[in-house]
Amino acid sequence: MKKEFDFILIGRITIDFNPTDYYNNLENSSLFKKYIGGSAANIAIGLSRLKNKVGFFGSVSDDQFGNFVLNVFENEKIDISHIKKTKDHKLGLTFTEMLSEEKSTILMYRDNVADLQIDVSDIDLDYILRTKILVISGTSLAKSPSREAVLKALFLAKNNGIKVVFDIDYRPYSWKNLDEVSLYYQIVAQNSDLIIGSYEEIQLTSRFCLENPENLIDDDYAKYWLKFVDLIIIKNGKKGSKLYQKDKKLVAKIVPVKMLKGYGGGDAYASLFLDHYLKNESDLENGLALATSAASIMVQSHSSFDLPDYQKILEFKDNALKSDPDLVQKKEWNAFKK
């Protein structure tokens, strides 16, 4: 069956307000610029800009902000046929506090948010069958009815041979407690093909399936999760990231840059890596170099979605490799060797 879409995503859509009078406390900021936000939305836009066909399962408010999101998606050539409007819920609002190049905080308003109102009846098997990869953002598991909708999409994809990517995307907002987080993250992770998360997110996902997960290192987590998935990426902020498969381990550094803000790189990282994973799975070293380069580019940007064109990212990556040929290193590794 010919696939109409390269990726369909399900997850968080928000409105971001980033201060233009930055390096200031939020209470003293007066001027803000409005952007589309949310990890799933940012990744969808990034993938579309990389010439992928992208669809989306989602829910937005039936108001001006909801219209803004749909207009942005249409302008970015993302299919909106499965994004519904809800009259009784509003899109989440995110205000960013950019205190310095290194330090940023986020103030979120996510009570009864629209993006968590997607329902099991909104999940269409025919739509899922039209994609090569389903990308699930972990925030969409925080509450019902979105939680059940995501699980339906997960199992429909899995049972029909559609690859599933789990972008953990943990945000404490909306969740009742950590046990709930770990329970649903574990269910999705154990039924995925690829996991992307920070060390802390992987630890949270592993609380019920590994003993004393807080004492484990990246390699320990990888050995466990590779029993279920084909590939896992563990990110460690300024320490870089690691990619694991059963017989492959790659270690990527970050590309040092003068940052504008201390967040926003993760969605660009995911966009570039997933694009490369789909198009050239045999060359993951280059995919990881592109991903870490894209992350460094985005922490210099005022928004978290405005990914530059591929040629600029490629040039940035090539220059980074000239400065540091060991930007991505291959390590000796076999997950199941005794």
From Swiss-Prot:
It holds the Pfam family PfkB. The keyword Ligase does not apply. It catalyses: 5-dehydro-2-deoxy-D-gluconate + ATP = 6-phospho-5-dehydro-2-deoxy-D-gluconate + ADP + H(+). One of its GO terms (molecular function) is ATP binding. InterPro entries: DKG_kinase_firmi, Myo_inos_IolC, Myo_inos_IolC-like_sf, PfkB_Carbo_kinase, PfkB_dom, Ribokinase-like. Pathway: Polyol metabolism; myo-inositol degradation into acetyl-CoA; acetyl-CoA from myo-inositol: step 5/7. Transmembrane segments: none annotated. The keyword Nucleotide-binding applies. Its EC number is 2.7.1.92. Keywords: ATP-binding, Kinase, Nucleotide-binding, Transferase. Catalyzes the phosphorylation of 5-dehydro-2-deoxy-D-gluconate (2-deoxy-5-keto-D-gluconate or DKG) to 6-phospho-5-dehydro-2-deoxy-D-gluconate (DKGP). Belongs to the carbohydrate kinase PfkB family. This is 5-dehydro-2-deoxygluconokinase. It comes from Mesomycoplasma hyopneumoniae (strain 7448) (Mycoplasma hyopneumoniae).
